[in-house]
């Protein structure tokens, strides 16, 4: 019996879609909050293989999801490249900034990242041993544009203005940074696969702010390069791409990049995504609005059924359109799973 998640990624249409949730290991779970407190802070948790493996396993024990995703953060890679990274309470991540070619050239090379990231690979090895045999293990990284937005601005921002400014005013420095991140991402994900990940997911959280040719050059092209290299090194490796809020850019994204599955956010309707992206044959992942994990009740049941129904004629992995939030009720996740699996 092949894992349901892998079957969907190979293009099978299943009677019940496999399910996992972005940020399924997170602050909505009391056991996660306890383990994070034990670690001391978020980054300490990411770099502690035993505790990072534990929080990855917690939602699998509680809910029996079809997949587990490595507990880490997309900003561990820029930290390994030499950027300073810290988290401010209530404010999120902060980083040192890169604003010119000198800053890019000061970064470490792609082969120098592994010492800092060694604990992440150890987490992968632990999970490859300890996950239930029916659970698919997903590794991940941020995509170059999204990672670059943090490295340029030093923080998350609503409009990614600093990254757009560098792109438009110092294209050589911007492209050099994108190339550095792209090369390092390939090495990072390759090591995750060697350490036991069965699938990798590429998170381009800010892809939606790239328009027209910029989307092709800085969302599509890096994804294509990363996917081609990973598949050359690891034949048969399934890859999920998530160009969040791409809108019309979702159409043809899998074909252009070589991704096996495109994750869809909830800014588009499941019916639109089924007609334009899935088309009865391409694997899609998504796309329930995370708000229903807070509100629950019949609204959650009906919205869940709508997503399942929209995608039932092609390969589908059920997920949210974005990460589950700290305000979510763990009981609503149980209701979600029961609705999908017909319990």
Curated annotation (Swiss-Prot):
Domain of life according to the entry: Bacteria
Secretion signal, residue range per the UniProt entry: none
CDD domains in the record: URO-D (cd00717)
Swiss-Prot/TrEMBL site (Transition state stabilizer) positions: 73
Chief location category: cytoplasm
GO molecular function: uroporphyrinogen decarboxylase activity
EC number(s) stated in the UniProt entry for this protein: 4.1.1.37
Gene Ontology annotations of biological process type: protoporphyrinogen IX biosynthetic process from glutamate
Keywords: Cytoplasm, Decarboxylase, Lyase, Porphyrin biosynthesis
Keyword Magnesium tagged: no
Major enzyme class: lyase
Entry's localization field: Cytoplasm
UniProt cross-references to SUPFAM superfamilies, sorted A to Z: UROD/MetE-like
Keyword Manganese: no
Cellular-component GO terms for this entry: cytosol
Classification via InterPro entries: UROD/MetE-like_sf, Uroporphyrinogen_deCO2ase_HemE, Uroporphyrinogen_deCOase
Residues reported to bind substrate: 23-27, 73, 150, 205, 322
Quaternary structure (record): Homodimer.
Family of the protein in this entry: Belongs to the uroporphyrinogen decarboxylase family.
Function: Catalyzes the decarboxylation of four acetate groups of uroporphyrinogen-III to yield coproporphyrinogen-III.
NCBIfam families assigned to the protein according to its UniProt record, in alphabetical order: hemE
HAMAP family for this protein: URO_D
Classification via PANTHER family: METHYLTETRAHYDROFOLATE:HOMOCYSTEINE METHYLTRANSFERASE RELATED, UROPORPHYRINOGEN DECARBOXYLASE
The protein's name in its UniProt record: Uroporphyrinogen decarboxylase
Protein species of origin: Cereibacter sphaeroides (strain ATCC 17025 / ATH 2.4.3)
Primary gene name: hemE
